[in-house]
Amino acid sequence: MKIFGTDGVRGKAGVKLTPMFVMRLGIAAGLYFKKHSQTNKILIGKDTRKSGYMVENALVSALTSIGYNVIQIGPMPTPAIAFLTEDMRCDAGIMISASHNPFEDNGIKFFNSYGYKLKEEEERAIEEIFHDEELLHSSYKVGESVGSAKRIDDVIGRYIAHLKHSFPKHLNLQKLRIVLDTANGAAYKVAPVVFSELGADVLVINDEPNGCNINEQCGALHPNQLSQEVKKYRADLGFAFDGDADRLVVVDNLGNIVHGDKLLGVLGVYQKSKNALSSQAVVATSMSNLALKEYLKSQDLELKHCAIGDKFVSECMRLNKANFGGEQSGHIIFSDYAKTGDGLVCALQVSALVLESKLVSSIALNPFELYPQSLVNLNIQKKPPLESLKGYSALLKELDQLEIRHLIRYSGTENKLRILLEAKDEKLLESKMQELKEFFEGQLC
């Protein structure tokens, strides 16, 4: 049975993520990390979901039962766990979060001792241990060999200092008025402190988590409220984070949502202008707009494509010796400062770019026009191989003949089919998207 999806393990808390399942997974992961153990410590953080307490306690019980010492640091962004795992010299880090999903869901993400997400072969190794009954039941420790757990509440200061270090020393944010939407999630404490300490005039919304309101009509998936607040407050910029703050959505001074591919383009060129790129390559996923590739080429930069998911972006960056890349969804990686997408690092770099451009953000963050794209997330009931659907091959052939770029795939974390189409003719695009929706609804819903 496959346990891991495209971003760790995710499911409905109490249904897939039961205490027994989480304990079993925790033991399996712990036994895997034990093979390369240096410090016998594992770090655990979480977002603000109510079910986080249940998942955390199950993981602590599992890990201490096989002799691991556990450090619990409470609600923190996913990139903070990646950073602190390496900074505090832990064997591994665990983030309890379902990212942008509703509060009923939860998830578990693992990081190695260097703060990187696990590779697929590492996840498969954990799955093999998960299904090995004899190994699991022979691994419990007794007496003094049982591990301990302690909660540390002041590590937030390390991450805040790290974030401030990523911001150019010759700049401050005193000239910027900024609205932050923390999605009632993991960034609700960190984000306001960082921007205030760097001098910004800050307004914060959706920073009162109650365990059930994470991502609820707010944050990166629902930036309309942020857009309204930016216009009302006459702010220079607005930043919306998702539940675990590894994703960023930017709103300009006019209240417009800045497309993720435009962010990748303008930030890549900005990094080049500072001689901060380690290579002439920028990494993005196969969902990126063709206009991004053309814009980067005009600036003597090469776009490298990879599979969808920020861990694949990170792997592709390492392979190409690149230190900048991301997804149009808002997962953007500055690997000099973060091993995974970090919404706060990205927000600070966007702020620096706007300051140094001496332009309003609606101009500074609008470097090129995009080709028309349409993205639909279709709720489905089943996930058979797409190639097995009657008429699917003919459908793709027709799209190719019409020069419509297409990317059709199942979500790795939800029961959804993601359909992306891109073409120069917007009316044709809309017509074909409707045809595709009807085709897949008839066979998958």
Curated annotation (Swiss-Prot):
GO biological process: carbohydrate metabolic process; peptidoglycan biosynthetic process; UDP-N-acetylglucosamine biosynthetic process
One Pfam family linked to the record: PGM_PMM_III
Free-text comment on the cofactor: Binds 1 Mg(2+) ion per subunit.
Catalytic activity: alpha-D-glucosamine 1-phosphate = D-glucosamine 6-phosphate
PTM comment, free text: Activated by phosphorylation.
Family statement: Belongs to the phosphohexose mutase family.
Job description of the protein: Catalyzes the conversion of glucosamine-6-phosphate to glucosamine-1-phosphate.
NCBIfam families attached to this UniProt entry: glmM
Protein name (record): Phosphoglucosamine mutase
Gene: glmM
